[in-house]
Curated annotation (Swiss-Prot):
GO biological process: coenzyme A biosynthetic process
Reactions catalysed: 3'-dephospho-CoA + ATP = ADP + CoA + H(+)
Protein species of origin: Xylella fastidiosa (strain Temecula1 / ATCC 700964)
Keywords attached to this entry: ATP-binding, Coenzyme A biosynthesis, Cytoplasm, Kinase, Nucleotide-binding, Transferase
DPCK domain mapped to chain residues: 5-203
Segments traversing the membrane: none
A Pfam cross-reference name: CoaE
PANTHER family: BIFUNCTIONAL COENZYME A SYNTHASE-RELATED, DEPHOSPHO-COA KINASE-RELATED
Lineage: Bacteria, Pseudomonadati, Pseudomonadota, Gammaproteobacteria, Lysobacterales
Descriptive protein name: Dephospho-CoA kinase
Family: Belongs to the CoaE family.
Location(s) in or outside the cell: Cytoplasm
Binding of ATP, residues: 13-18
EC primary class: transferase
Amino acid sequence: MSVYAVGLTGGVACGKSLLAQLFEALNTTVVDADTIARQVVEPGPVLNCIVARFGSKILRADGCLDRRFLRQRVFADVAERKALEAIVHPVIRARLKQAAAAAAGPYVLVVIPLLAEAGGRIGYPWLQRILVVDAIPEVQHARLMQRDSIDAEQASLMIAAQIGRKERLAIADDIVFNDGDPAHLGGQVCNLDARYRALASVFSDVD
């Protein structure tokens, strides 16, 4: 792939969306896996496969996916979640790569929430660099409770359902610490943007 691609990941409520917005403000092209995931499950062949596996109860009256119902069904069942991922993840990965390859600009930022779960570059070998946005667990927990209007137990369950912080940080080439200080966060993003532009300027695709 000829474009210089940086993968962005982080735990729930660590600030992936905020970081992506800050990069966009610097005229960086951003491709978001969550956006593509929503497109993938619109009425069509992928949704048909999901219905064949999970039944028509996952559909709303208008024939579209009831995302909340399906999320609740697979959240507490590892086998069900893996079955869903086996259907949608290959399609999402292929479309992510296509979107990244078509991106304009010196480099593209690809937001992938489950990048660590995919093994980092094992799952996404076309990424040249991986950026992890991190927050201390106490801050992450408090943000999640406030953002989703949930109690402490629910927040703990959501965080526990993800890969561990240590494993996520282990795949990072770069780390941004989102401590809640906008100036500090903005400064980190500006420095990284300059670094990525410099790296992209000398990047040569070897595929």
